[in-house]
Regions:
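Long, low-complexity intrinsically disordered regions
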Residues: 1-230
């Protein structure tokens, strides 16, 4: 029978904290803990990393994966920037896509990017007469709806913005529902955490508590997750 002491030991092992991961094991860990985040003390544009998990320089490794567009940028947990594998974009779009509420500025930029893109913010400013403080929130609104994509493949400031479906023609952001996406990602996180509460999962994914709790109940009903017994 598992005790909390056993849980802690197994969690540390599964998070590669007691023995650092090689590349294949690291890729699996990154997938299970996605979206990957920038460490808060890193400089602008630095790749995401999993601190103290890899037996190699994972900042350099993930930088290479960014340049190859294996890792791509989006706005996920509560609108925060994160990086996921491009092959997982449809799943995370289903998990995080927000309903699009158009504004005058967001529609102007969406049409402009569709006609002239890719464009950086400086070009948008020049072509529309809008200020950066007007452009940025409009782009974030479009980004959170998975209507535009910011191509941050290196640490430079001069990043191009594309229509989402131009960069991901085979991805339908509406194909996977949030419920279905949660049923896929929660077992990944539970495997790494060993013991996972709905509150923990809510905090990790930045999603409504009721959605997370309902998905965990369904996974328990299916026998994929097992309820903890004291």
């Amino acid at each position: 029978m598992l005790t909390m002491e056993n849980v802690t030991a197994l969690r540390m092992r599964r998070h590669c904290l007691t023995r650092r991961a090689g590349a294949a094991e690291y890729d699996a860990l990154y997938l299970d803990l996605s979206p990957g985040l920038n460490v808060h003390w890193h400089g602008f544009g630095q790749p995401p990393c999993l601190v103290e998990r890899a037996d190699f320089d994972d900042v350099e490794y993930n930088g290479r994966r960014q340049r190859q567009r294996i890792l791509v940028k989006g706005r996920f947990q509560n609108g925060n920037i994160g990086f996921v594998e491009a092959a997982q974009m449809e799943l995370f779009a289903g998990l995080y896509r927000r309903p699009y509420k158009p504004t005058e500025h967001s529609e102007l930029l969406r049409e402009l990017i569709g006609r002239e893109g890719p464009l950086n913010i400086e070009a948008m400013k020049r072509m529309t007469g809008l200020l950066v403080k007007q452009i940025t929130p409009a782009l974030h609104r479009l980004q959170e709806a998975f209507l535009v994509f910011e191509d941050q493949f290196d640490g430079e400031w001069d990043r191009g913005w594309y229509l989402f479906d131009e960069m991901f023609p085979d991805v339908d952001p509406a194909r996977i529902s949030r419920t279905e996406a949660l049923l896929r990602v929660l077992p990944r996180l539970a495997h790494r955490q060993v013991y996972l509460t709905a509150a923990d999962a809510k905090d990790f994914y930045g999603l409504p508590a009721r959605d997370v709790a309902a998905a965990m109940e369904e996974l328990a009903r299916q026998g994929i997750l097992v309820r903890w017994r004291e």
